[in-house]
Amino acid sequence: MTSMASIANRQNSYWLSWEKGYLEACEAFGYDTNVQTNNGEVQTQQQQFDSAVSNDADFIVGQTYTNAAAITLAETLVEAGTPGVLAVTIADWYVPQDAGGEYVTFFTPHFVNHAYSAAKMLFEAMGGSGTFVHIEGNRGTAPNIGRNKGVDLALEEYPDIEMAGSRQPGNFIRSDARDVMNDKVSQYGDDIDGFFGQNDAVALGGITVLEENDIDVPVVGIDASEPGLAAVAEDRMTGTVSGMGPWQAGWSVAKCHDFLNGHTLSDAEKMMSFNAPVCVKNPDEWTDTIDRLPVVDAADYNDAIFSGETPYDWKKMSVVESGEDAWDPQIDMQPMNLDDMKTVLDWKEEDKPNGYSLPGAYTDSAAQEETTQLYADRFQSNPLE
């Protein structure tokens, strides 16, 4: 039995940790592995999918680099009869059912909750007042839009906090974040009281400029990358929210394994979101402030994810392997209804294609409640706590 995983690169710890989860899960379920890097190039990723299906891969897992690419990649899976999971990025007004059964499921971090929690942590660390810099990521992408919404939501609760001018894009990379922070420091200087980085790379890029200018302020990021966790340990960052790379990959493998062995997800399970932990140096200081996400020790998280094998029981994620009453996602997951899609993925009613209608499960409150309860009941163990 063979598989293929599609990742952007091996240059950052998020993708390295994602690859680690994929390799571990495939070993647990007995699949040969094949990791392909696409460097964020849609055409390269499409060629890799085409090659995998022509070589009779049993399943494909990964993330699409652009929203629109999700459609053509999903169609490739369905036309070949090859099951797959495409996570995190999906086209507007498009769900797995629009492609076909082989698009096993879509899931994504709850970008809004993650950024809201990180922003609350930052604003509390700032003492509830002052001016902060917010450097965003790639404009127009769901992670960036959702995280902006989360920060704005937190701002509503802190009337004495203000943003240092408008957000500027750091494109999720250090060098661009440095350029933006240089501009912000020249404009605001010592009036900067905090910094929100749209991911750890942005946070770390901005920190270097702040440090060069002797500006010592609270900083938060998102991803819980190795460099980000190191910055938390060194008190250069207050905290970082995990991207859960290994879990994302392993969950994808488990769902494809279930599909290949006759278990299909309900309609409401086809679009899911998850909540990841906030990684800090002293969790007890933050458990009362952070109410939407779990709070974990950054050093313990670093050991669990990046040192040796990850703590997940991959077979436990499989309904086929563990049984209907014993499987466990090992993370907090919820189905996405239409409102969630609009909030987290930034779907707008005016962009809906003429004549398009979502499958009923996404607006059926009973189906949503049943699925929410199912995943709450099955979430029995959190290996990171």
Which residues make up each language-model segment?
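A residue-level marker of the well-folded mature domains of exported/periplasmic proteins
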Residues: M1-E385
